[in-house]
Amino acid sequence: MEKIKKCIANLKVEGKLKVYQMTVLVMTLFLVLVALISTLVIRSNIEKITEVWSPALEDLQELETMTAKYRIKQYQHLVESDDAVMTSCEEEIQKLESQIQDTDAKLEAIMSANSKAQKGQDDYEVANAAWEKYRAASDEILKLSRENKQQEAAKLMTGEVYEVYKAFTEKLTILRDEFQVELDQAKTMANVCTIIIFVVIVAAG
């Protein structure tokens, strides 16, 4: 009878040990899975940060800076009477047009490759259309300036053409704000997952 009791007790201990071992195994697998998923999420968000949101924001900032310089050069052209200075302004404007076109192409490629970035496509297209309209008016402004019709050129720059430029900058600002939110979210997600991995390492240790 005593032997039977001992056998039953041993079986209970073995059962408890097996349950414990299974629990440890399941918990270990769970922690490994959490760490793996977190690592993948970190990698995905780092790619978004380095390949989408950061370069897109950089391009938007460059566009804002270059278009502002473009407008400054137009004003400089209006107030100058020296032919050499006016020619220099025209050359700078042409150079800026080329740089703006290149930066715009880079931004378009980034947006086309990312589904979230494509949500800003409508604002981007409106901004592009506004810029093309403004750029087309630039030729007329410079022509009037060359003909010593500065008053007409200034009226054009501060009137309808300015409204077009303002519409362009407003859409760029909307895009920049949207992309900044996405960048901040990607950084937050990467940081949270990093903390999770740290907790998993501590728990596993």
Predicted feature locations:
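N-terminal sensory and localization modules of signal-transduction and trafficking proteins
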Residues: 1-10
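Amphipathic alpha-helical segments and their boundaries
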Residues: 17-70, 89-90, 111-131, 183-193
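Juxtamembrane amphipathic/coiled-coil helical coupling segments that flank
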Residues: 38-53, 71-78, 104-112, 137-201
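Extended, amphipathic, non-transmembrane alpha-helical segments
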Residues: 69, 99-103, 130-137
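Extracytoplasmic/periplasmic helical hairpin
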Residues: 70-93, 115
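Alpha-helical segments in soluble extracytoplasmic regions
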Residues: 82-110
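Short, charged, amphipathic alpha-helical segments
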Residues: 87-98, 118-129, 151-162
